[in-house]
């Protein structure tokens, strides 16, 4: 298992491929194509900083720009592979040592060294000046107050995300110019996974320090990925140029332009008219219409992300867990998959994925569809039909509004009076004025362990608890224990108990279905979709016919 590896992992994949890739000589005509990709959104936070933009749309955007020491194989099943580190080894239960690739260039031409890695994980860039390793609390306050950042001060969500990602990181030190060592305060079998997750992307120290303000940096970050930022227009477009000194070989595309096109119909019409080369987040019911045109095809599949309905247990009606249980039993999930997703995804085994390997809890299921049980639970809870608000965005997620309408009807049939309240952005979803009760969310796993999902998102430092929607003392105790437990059998038992609490006994959420993402493109472009939101546009995955 990746998380328990002790052996040195040899460099493969991109490194081997890059040796065979020629670089363009200065002055040689550049015949590489430029492409345009229409997306629903580029960034929710008006920034390109992974420590602030922890979102589905950010995951797609950042795959062009950033890289981690240990990467996920986007052309495989997201298994770990050497990235900016060519190899790594376990020193002990608290320590991992990594050997960096030599000759890796940042977008500004500087060579990446251990100094940049150490700075990436520093207080100045990640944890903030008040970082206390002995204090488990994060500093999360509000959500995506987009333009509130002053000077070089870190936005409050940056140290919160950093602490959530690395709750006990003691130090990162340079052993020599190309060797770094991560040391945790406590044992952590997931340390390699944390090093490879979104937010652990290596940045240029010089570029960060030279930026006049944090927002200047966050809108034009300098990293090592195959494409570099030329221009970012918030909520409009992102223009990227090929990073021709890229360590993995010359990128196959001269420039990539991502444009924000929120409406599905506009994205599809733009593709068919030749305005766009790729469009993202295509609803399944639109796939046949697109593929009637022989010039286009749609690729995609279920990904490592689940769609959820999330509860605020502080709402007077939802304070009784039986009401939240009734919500879960009133949902015919398979009907949603069959009708809105044309059977192209599935109802998963709760908030987990098979790539957890031995940590996957077999024989676990989502709550069964049982309207009679839902009605009985509501009767036992003495629910009288009071309205329950459901804050909703307009199709941030694929099929979001249609799914919400189906859910409201299913809940109505069970006796729940749920009222949709449309909101414009995530800040309005989370704001405390009025009564919060039900909202949409999706959860991914940043690496192959439950720590990266149920603990990171619903544990004591997770977003749901940090914004004050839900808490559970036993869940929090288990989360803290699982962070430091090294016995995999004990860890799995802890995870199973977390699922029982969060999905059955005191519901924090209920899983609707596994998410799926579908990308439509020109058929004369050879390209494959990955099992995640990230898009792979290195030379191994792009060619024009």
Describe each PLM feature range.
Residues 38-92, 122, 220-223:
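N-terminal lobe/hinge region of extracytoplasmic solute-binding protein
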Residues 73-75, 156-157, 166-167, 177-178, ...:
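Gly/Pro-rich hinge or "lid" segments in bacterial periplasmic/extracellular proteins
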Residues 215-218, 244-289, 300, 417:
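Ligand-site clamp/hinge motif
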Residues 130-149, 350-354, 422, 427-484, ...:
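Acidic-aromatic pocket-rim loops
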